[in-house]
Amino acid sequence: MTEMSFLSSEVLVGDLMSPFDQSGLGAEESLGLLDDYLEVAKHFKPHGFSSDKAKAGSSEWLAVDGLVSPSNNSKEDAFSGTDWMLEKMDLKEFDLDALLGIDDLETMPDDLLTTLDDTCDLFAPLVQETNKQPPQTVNPIGHLPESLTKPDQVAPFTFLQPLPLSPGVLSSTPDHSFSLELGSEVDITEGDRKPDYTAYVAMIPQCIKEEDTPSDNDSGICMSPESYLGSPQHSPSTRGSPNRSLPSPGVLCGSARPKPYDPPGEKMVAAKVKGEKLDKKLKKMEQNKTAATRYRQKKRAEQEALTGECKELEKKNEALKERADSLAKEIQYLKDLIEEVRKARGKKRVP
């Protein structure tokens, strides 16, 4: 009973000192602490420590850490003798789950060690990425020559190729739920990101091709993905990956952004409507032009008629003026004649 209480207290001390609470590392740390305490116990016997000294030393060491379990405050003295240090005990007899207090952990120590190794493998790329600059990333393909990794010999979008993974990485499938408990910065493996790389290769070249062809953009015609895949200017880096099969044109069209141009059917309908509107406008313009011409001709005819009438009236007026003048002269002549006759008769009467 004393041995069980001491073991439970020591295991609780190791559990509190573990860096990760209730994680897979707790079991390994607790096992390591038990082994260290057993090795320390072997050295106490040859030096001849009494039970009081062993009790004082152990209590003093536990007091320095400040992690003494409240179970040691019982009336029963767990350090009454040092005979328990020489006994060989089998840890398989004890229920580690009950001692550690981990009820939700159902895996065995071997599974925990395997999960811990996988977690360390996940942390290794993160440490390398933070220590190095972003452009100088580690090449995951070990058999490629260094000449292909130079920036002056790589195609503009070679970084979007899906990288072939090693069999070890593909075979190992770590528990993502366990890795997420250790920290939020854990990223997914390269195998899970492989479809994303393929999608990027399918989408980006089409955009680059559209930007590199100003003549097509000027004329309003965009090169189709089929013609781009069949063009001789296709990057050799994308051809050099035989393990990757290119997606179908339907997948390319579905993943690419929608084109800003209208379908040909809508273009034809719009052209017909525009042609009809233009014809109606031209007909209306012709009608307006004809009406204006007719109006001008009518006004010209009316003006000519008025001018002719005016000239005729002017001629009549001149004739009437001449006749009036002649009549006025005749009247004056007659007046003068009558006056002379009157004078002549008056002279005849006077004598």
UniProtKB/Swiss-Prot annotation:
Modified residues (Phosphoserine): 215, 219, 224, 231, 235, 245, 248
Compositional bias (Polar residues): 230-246
Residue ranges occupied by any bZIP domain in the UniProt entry: 278-341
Signal peptide: none
Coiled-coil annotated spans: 280-340
Region (Leucine-zipper) location: 306-334
Lineage top rank: taxon: Eukaryota
Region annotation Basic motif: where it falls in the sequence: 280-300
Consequence the record notes for mutating residue 167 to A: Increased stability in low oxygen conditions
Transmembrane segments annotated in the record for this chain: none
Subcellular location(s) of the protein: Nucleus; Nucleus speckle; Cytoplasm; Cell membrane
Gene Ontology terms for molecular function: cAMP response element binding protein binding; DNA binding; DNA-binding transcription activator activity, RNA polymerase II-specific; DNA-binding transcription factor activity; DNA-binding transcription factor activity, RNA polymerase II-specific; general transcription initiation factor binding; identical protein binding; leucine zipper domain binding
Modified residues (4-hydroxyproline): 236
Keywords: Acetylation, Activator, Biological rhythms, Cell membrane, Coiled coil, Cytoplasm, Cytoskeleton, DNA-binding, Hydroxylation, Isopeptide bond, Membrane, Nucleus, Phosphoprotein, Repressor, Transcription, Transcription regulation, Ubl conjugation
Region annotated Interaction with GABBR1, chain positions: 305-341
Protein name from the UniProt record: Cyclic AMP-dependent transcription factor ATF-4
Gene giving rise to this polypeptide: ATF4
